[in-house]
Amino acid sequence: MKQTIILLYGGRSAEREVSVLSAESVMRAVNYDRFTVKTFFISQSGDFIKTQEFSHAPGQEDRLMTNETIDWDKKVAPSAIYEEGAVVFPVLHGPMGEDGSVQGFLEVLKMPYVGCNILSSSLAMDKITTKRVLESAGIAQVPYVAIVEGDDVTAKIAEVEEKLAYPVFAKPSNMGSSVGISKSENQEELRQALKLAFRYDSRVLVEQGVNAREIEVGLLGNYDVKSTLPGEVVKDVAFYDYDAKYIDNKITMDIPAKISDDVVAVMRQNAETAFRAIGGLGLSRCDFFYTDKGEIFLNELNTMPGFTQWSMYPLLWDNMGISYPELIERLVDLAKESFDKREAHLI
């Protein structure tokens, strides 16, 4: 009997379009000799819509349903995703997806799911909290200033100018895929950048700009985590923003990255240490800055990295000899392992 995968996609965050792209890639990469895939779309308003079911490989013309094509008569209660023995793959990016919200819901339903648990998902989603945890683990971070809604913005800008040097980057603390991030070269630009960032979150991180290469490491495992050789994001733009990543296609990737063996070793060790520090499970992608001075800064941990066919995470593992279909199988097995461990602790 085939294993059922419940594929959740869409979502309420600004990253829902990336989620659809990732979910379509997963849908096509699944080994249908072993799995059946049932899909549920989460609308921007938070409604759950039962969409398609695939018992064999979809054709090239098959597309996952989205806001424009779903049948709203198939709206269901969120709990309708429950199926005994099924494993949920929440291909959801950003708030209300990879921030612990959906993970908590799935634990209430008593369903195994791919990826990090409630705590590690919510922790990694918040850039400010992540920095504080990784600092305690002794992992180098880019200098930063945290700003919370209600703070005196003028005073905080003065703190930024005292502790950091332009250019700086303002980022919503609780957002991914470079949404709401902008670069500032002076005080007026910083004020505008803060306004943009506060549209997406009530907590904002202002980071020192660094002249650096962007290097990424893939992580896979629960309690015995493994890492990939690093890959590098090679940009044709000054700033790797949302449009550059997903719309304009102005990036290429070097896999493996052209860096020394010593730097590779440090990055892999730091990535594994960071994953353990947040209590990671299943998977993550760890992003580093490697400066022209030879400094290595851990930028962020992404607990549900992009899963499109051109995304770094699956390509990193492909370079390690693990194909996209095999990667999905391993993630499903890891989900069942962590579920069994979680249930065993409820004594």
From Swiss-Prot:
Domain (ATP-grasp) ranges: 131-333
Reaction catalyzed: 2 D-alanine + ATP = D-alanyl-D-alanine + ADP + phosphate + H(+)
Residues annotated as binding ATP: 161-216
Classification via Pfam families: Dala_Dala_lig_C, Dala_Dala_lig_N
Compartments where found: Cytoplasm
InterPro entries reported in the protein's UniProt record: ATP-grasp, ATP_grasp_subdomain_1, D-Ala_lig_Van_CS, D_ala_D_ala, Dala_Dala_lig_C, Dala_Dala_lig_N, PreATP-grasp_dom_sf
Cofactor entry: Mg(2+); Mn(2+)
Cofactor annotation remark: Binds 2 magnesium or manganese ions per subunit.
Domain of life, source organism: Bacteria
Pathway: Cell wall biogenesis; peptidoglycan biosynthesis
Main function: Cell wall formation.
Record-stated family: Belongs to the D-alanine--D-alanine ligase family.
Protein name (Swiss-Prot/TrEMBL): D-alanine--D-alanine ligase
Source organism per UniProt: Streptococcus pneumoniae (strain P1031)
